[in-house]
């Protein structure tokens, strides 16, 4: 594979990993920086290609989810264990962790992957916390 083909392949892979919001921003930036002659005919001028593109985008929106992790409550007898877990988990100091659990419910992570959200929930629940994971469709 030549260098241009390899570059294009990697570019497409990276684009496919992007969220709809990210794609929208990239499109706007490209529109600002690239001027295309009005006589230029692209593949997207074909309605069937546009429709399949819409289907792919709609499917991608459903697949691309981000999650928020909300710490709701905790077992008071495990307060110290939870404070230690929070300090390690979200890299905050002792006072910040103590203040955080005194003002529940609190969102401790926003826009994280499903796997990360589930692992974090498990860790917090092992420390006596009650945790909710909410999803955001991007």
Swiss-Prot record:
The entry's keywords: Plastid, Ribonucleoprotein, Ribosomal protein
- Which SUPFAM superfamilies has this protein been placed in? ClpS-like
| Pfam families named in the record | Ribosomal_L12 (PF00542)
What start-end ranges are recorded for coiled-coil regions in this protein? Answer: none
Q: Where in the cell is it found?
A: Plastid
The main location is: plastid
Q: Where does the record locate the signal sequence feature?
A: none
Cellular-component GO terms for this entry:
plastid; ribonucleoprotein complex; ribosome
Report the CDD domains cross-referenced here.
Ribosomal_L7_L12
Q: Name one GO molecular function term.
A: structural constituent of ribosome
* GO BP terms: translation
Q: Which family does it belong to?
A: Belongs to the bacterial ribosomal protein bL12 family.
- Quaternary form? Homodimer. Part of the ribosomal stalk of the 50S ribosomal subunit. Forms a multimeric L10(L12)X complex, where L10 forms an elongated spine to which 2 to 4 L12 dimers bind in a sequential fashion. Binds GTP-bound translation factors.
As for what it does, the entry says: Forms part of the ribosomal stalk which helps the ribosome interact with GTP-bound translation factors. Is thus essential for accurate translation.
Q: What is the name of the protein in this document? A: Large ribosomal subunit protein bL12c
Species name:
Euglena longa
């Amino acid at each position: 594979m030549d260098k241009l083909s390899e570059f294009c392949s990697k570019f497409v892979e990276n684009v496919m990993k992007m969220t709809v919001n990210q794609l929208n921003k990239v499109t706007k930036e490209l529109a600002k920086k690239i001027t295309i002659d009005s006589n230029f005919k692209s593949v997207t001028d074909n309605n069937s290609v546009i429709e399949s593109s819409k289907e792919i985008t709609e499917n991608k929106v459903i697949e691309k989810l981000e999650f928020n992790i909300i710490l709701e409550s905790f077992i008071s007898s495990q307060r110290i264990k939870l404070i230690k877990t929070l300090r390690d988990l979200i890299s905050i100091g002792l006072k910040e962790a103590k203040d955080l659990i005194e003002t529940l419910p609190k969102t401790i992570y926003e826009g994280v992957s499903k796997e990360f959200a589930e692992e974090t929930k498990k860790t917090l629940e092992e420390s006596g916390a009650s945790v909710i994971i909410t999803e955001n469709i991007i």
